[in-house]
Every structure is written in C-alpha cells, then in structure tokens.
Amino acid sequence: MSQNLPPVDEARLAAEWEADRQVLANLAANGDVARIARPVDVSFRGSEQDFERVLIIASQFGFVELDREEDEDGDLFLFLECVQPVDEQSIRALTRKCLQIEMMCGVEYDGWGCEAQTGGVH
C-alpha cells in the first residue's frame, strides 16, 4: 500500500531544519560520523487513536514503535525508531517524512534524536 504524501510547507520545513542543524552540530562536536547508520528516534504528540494511524503509515517507511509516554501535563507521546545515517540529506528527508505524517494523522511532530557514532569499537 502506498500513500499519497501531502506537500510540506517550506517555511515549516525551514524552521525544523534550523533545529535539526543544532542537533547535527552537537553530534559533530561529540565526534559523530554522520554517514554511519544508527537507530534514530522520532516523537509525535497526539492521542492513542491518532497514534494507531501514525503506526500504519510510519511502518511503510521503516519505522518501528519504541515507546509511548504521558508527560506531567497529560500529553501523550509516541516514540518511533528507524535506522539511518544522519547526514544533511538523510535528516532533511526524515524531517519531511515526519511532517507529512503529522499532516496526515493530526499529530504534532516533536523532533528526532540519536546517539553520536564515532566509528570506534566499544
């Protein structure tokens, strides 16, 4: 099953990219090698009903469910994971996909994160 993905507002994408650049700069400062694929988590705020739709769509892009949490204000968060590099092109594509999922499912994309990968052996 393939989805017709909605176009993303370029101003919103640019705003997200500013936040993404800060995350990438922090990773680089910690010795990250961006081309190394690793688990990357993304989160969405919404309702349990919305999350079921998110899972159906996101699974088509290789995301798996990590966790669901409720914060102190009662907001529900869904955490998903995929494995990918974190170079600029990969993160721009990830953010675009997440914003499209946000639009299709009525949830709020809350960002992404990962651990720095230096290429060293532990």
Describe each model-derived feature in a short phrase.
Residues 1-122:
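Long, contiguous binding/interaction regions
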